[in-house]
């Protein structure tokens, strides 16, 4: 595939300074938006800048330059003095908005009011005095509001109320005290990119319908492969609807690499295939095996040590057992950042075993891949460059708005051979441009959402160094939490030693249990503590943190930090809140 030129398409220098002669990122977007959004793109740019860009001249390969501007509305005043208050939404319906005749003014007013609702929500998300969640039980919400779909349309006043109600009861995942999931935080540039992506409303299967986005996917995936350590960023990749699908892509491609005939003839034409992954790995490996007809029984779970890392000797033992039974080992999936412990499998040792037995090595770095952006922490993924494929979710540790997951493959062209179906109504071979940019045939999907723009725009805004600071801060906050609770009365660590990732796993032991002997009764009572505290957190709306059992360990808290808005004070608050809510248990 030919490489796009430097400048607008590139990420700029590592320090985030970029090329001074290039337009700013947002302005650059507005310069090209008209190519695939038409008037709507110009209107949104007008909302951003108070003016609108004229359509760029056709022809030429250079990104269009800024042109003369026109007013966004009839009044031509800043701020706009159009009589917005005269719009009575009670008498307007969706049919009164664009493309309706004379629909421009109500459309602008309606979208501005929606924007006001969104911006109020954004501001509240960072206000520590607001609740993380206004929790109601499902039956309460069902009874309080009529959520049913009707045959007749509702007016726009009711539609705006639905927008407000939906956000009122939504989780504020950007709140600095929301620690419940691996994906937290709310990045303003990423949010803006998501809005613009939805406005463009295009598909990713061919260059002709997504020219900018296809190029951005190319340069972004190439950059990610360079960071992994593949020479010159060589290889292939795709953005998929989450890490589970990325992992399934890896299984699909690994199977095709070993037995290409399976594409036409199916599983009946190949011997029984066996995949290997750690007992702490993500459940998506088994889901992928089920979906691909390999079967969950063909996924062998490898023992982990006390820190949750795969034991290489057990991996080799299980590979030999499978071969002795006449089965064919085809994939080993190592994990870089397990979901619960945040453990990193020993990738170099796993790579040696995969090379020895000629097995595809996949690294599920959905959670831990972000650490590759940090010079301080990337050593934890040493050996990832030897993998055949890597899953990396920027929507987790890097804070990109959901969804943004990439599957990176070391061998170029393999994904295309595995998945292409040559649909002639999409992938005509006599088009007038370089067909290597028609990337849709290597995807399982036909309709594919534009996920790259959020990551690309954030990268332009933050630079690699900005992501590094983000990662380092979150890891430092996890170390801060660990340093406080490791010797604090009422806390017990699930495993010894400083966490490798931002996962901090611990039990809170209420005063009533501290005097009990470490026996079955104590464990039974301790198992009920975390669920009760979590329920109280949600009912008060003060904070949220996850809990779970694992193996023979009863329910414990799993604290994860991926939101750079969090501070030491938020960690202190969490500790105090756990103690307040659990003191009487």
From Swiss-Prot:
This is Glutamate decarboxylase 2. Phosphorylated; which does not affect kinetic parameters or subcellular location. The gene is GAD2. GO terms for cellular component: axon; cytoplasm; cytoplasmic vesicle; cytosol; Golgi membrane; presynaptic membrane. It is an enzyme of class 4 (lyase). The lineage of its organism: Eukaryota, Metazoa, Chordata, Craniata, Vertebrata. A lipid is attached at residues 30, 45 (S-palmitoyl cysteine). It is a lipid-anchor; Peripheral membrane protein. Catalyzes the production of GABA. The modification N6-(pyridoxal phosphate)lysine is found at residue 396. It comes from Canis lupus familiaris (Dog). GO terms for molecular function: glutamate decarboxylase activity; pyridoxal phosphate binding.
């Amino acid at each position: 595939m030919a490489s796009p030129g430097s400048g607008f398409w590139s990420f700029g220098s590592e320090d985030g300074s970029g090329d001074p002669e290039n337009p700013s990122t947002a302005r650059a977007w507005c310069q090209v938006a008209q190519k695939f959004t038409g008037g709507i793109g110009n209107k949104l740019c007008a909302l951003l800048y108070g003016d609108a860009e004229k359509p760029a001249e056709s022809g030429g390969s250079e990104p269009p330059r800024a042109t003369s501007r026109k007013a966004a509305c009839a009044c031509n005043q800043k701020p706009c003095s159009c009589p917005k208050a005269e719009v009575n939404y009670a008498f307007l319906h969706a049919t009164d908005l664009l493309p309706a005749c004379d629909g421009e003014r109500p459309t602008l007013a309606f979208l501005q009011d929606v924007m006001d609702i969104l911006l109020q929500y954004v501001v509240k998300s960072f206000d520590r005095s607001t609740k993380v969640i206004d929790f109601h039980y499902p039956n309460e919400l069902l009874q309080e509001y009529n959520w049913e779909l009707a045959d007749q349309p509702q007016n726009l006043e009711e539609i705006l109320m639905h927008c407000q109600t939906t956000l009122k009861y939504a989780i504020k995942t950007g709140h600095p005290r929301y620690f419940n999931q691996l994906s937290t935080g709310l990045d303003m540039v990423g949010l803006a990119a998501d809005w613009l992506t939805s406005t463009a409303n295009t598909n990713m299967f061919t260059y002709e319908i997504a020219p900018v986005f296809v190029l951005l996917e190319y340069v972004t995936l190439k950059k990610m492969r360079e960071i992994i350590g593949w020479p010159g960023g060589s290889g292939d990749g795709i953005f998929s609807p989450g890490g589970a699908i990325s992992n399934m892509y890896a299984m699909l491609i690994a199977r095709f690499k070993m037995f290409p005939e399976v594409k036409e003839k199916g599983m009946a034409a190949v011997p029984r295939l066996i995949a290997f992954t750690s007992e702490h790995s993500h459940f998506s490996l088994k889901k992928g095996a089920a979906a691909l007809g390999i079967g969950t029984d063909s996924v062998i779970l490898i023992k982990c040590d006390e820190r949750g890392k795969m034991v290489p000797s057990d991996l080799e033992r299980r590979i030999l057992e499978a071969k002795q039974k006449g089965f064919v080992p085809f994939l080993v999936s190592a994990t870089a950042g397990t979901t619960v412990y945040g453990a990193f499998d020993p990738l170099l040792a796993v790579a040696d075993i995969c090379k020895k037995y000629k097995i595809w090595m996949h690294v599920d770095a959905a959670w831990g891949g972000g650490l590759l952006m940090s010079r301080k922490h990337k050593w934890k993924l040493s050996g990832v460059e030897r993998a055949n494929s890597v899953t990396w979710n920027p929507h987790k540790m890097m804070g990109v708005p959901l969804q943004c997951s990439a599957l990176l493959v070391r061998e170029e062209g393999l994904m295309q051979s595995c998945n292409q179906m040559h649909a002639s109504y999409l992938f005509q071979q006599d088009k007038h441009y370089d067909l290597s940019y028609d990337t849709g045939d290597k995807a399982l999907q036909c309709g594919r959402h534009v996920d790259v723009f959020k990551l690309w725009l954030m990268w332009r805004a933050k630079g690699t160094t900005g992501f590094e600071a983000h990662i380092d801060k979150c890891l430092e906050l996890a170390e801060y939490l660990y340093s406080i609770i490791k010797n604090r009365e009422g806390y017990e660590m699930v495993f010894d030693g400083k966490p490798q990732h931002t996962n901090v796993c611990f039990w809170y032991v209420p005063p009533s249990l501290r005097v009990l002997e470490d026996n079955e009764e104590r464990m039974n009572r301790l198992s009920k503590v975390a669920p009760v505290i979590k329920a109280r957190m949600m009912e008060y709306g003060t904070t949220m943190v996850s809990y779970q059992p694992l193996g023979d360990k009863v329910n414990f808290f799993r604290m994860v930090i991926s939101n750079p808005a969090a501070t030491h004070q938020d960690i202190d608050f969490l500790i105090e809140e756990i103690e307040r809510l659990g003191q009487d248990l």
